[in-house]
Amino acid sequence: MRGLLSLIGFSALLSAAVVLDRIAVIAGNHVIKASDIDRDIRLTDFLNRAQLNFNASAKRESAERLIAQQIIRDEIVSGGYRRPPESEAAQLEAQLLRDRFGGSQERLRQDLERYRLTQAELREQLLWQITVLQFINQRFQGGIVVTDEDARSYYDQHTADLKREYPKDSSFDALEPKIRSSLEGERINQSFNEWLDQARKSERVEFKQGAFAEKGVQ
């Protein structure tokens, strides 16, 4: 009898785990679980220094982020794009530790505990952010052209703002490299967003009913 009760108890635990980690979204050939959404919300709110929010809207936004991540991952694999080394995530983590926590590992650990995150999960998220930025540059930078006319037009339209921002030398010659870099960055981001929007529209996505119910902060 005791063995039977133990089996029943174990089965109940397994059932609870299945409910907790139910499939939330099917995107193409990929499955996004409830635990993936939970972790993404915790990481996003931690990095944004925001209060944890698990309402239906936050879960839906998280699901869309994770769908986009899968699209990008598929493109990285199919396109053979180079991935950054893990050491770059360690460098970004060190910068976060210095700028936000005054170099205190204990303060970082306590904040991670408050969001129920591990340092390994944080580092993985930082590595992913670097991966996305590197992919965007590799994939879209090559087709971007900023002409002399583009740079001059931007300068003429924003002269007053540029003079306030760079009072020592706001001449066109001095600011042209910054203007070109800014315009290039804007156009790279625009090309990336247009590509991602189109890819998202082409993706077969199924949201599972009941997976986005609001829950309290845990």
Language model region names:
Residues 1, 16-18:
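Absolute protein N-terminus
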Residues 41-57:
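Short, conserved catalytic-motif segment at the N-terminal edge
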Residues 3-13:
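Sec-dependent N-terminal signal peptides
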Residues 18-26, 32, 53-218:
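Peptidyl-prolyl cis-trans isomerase
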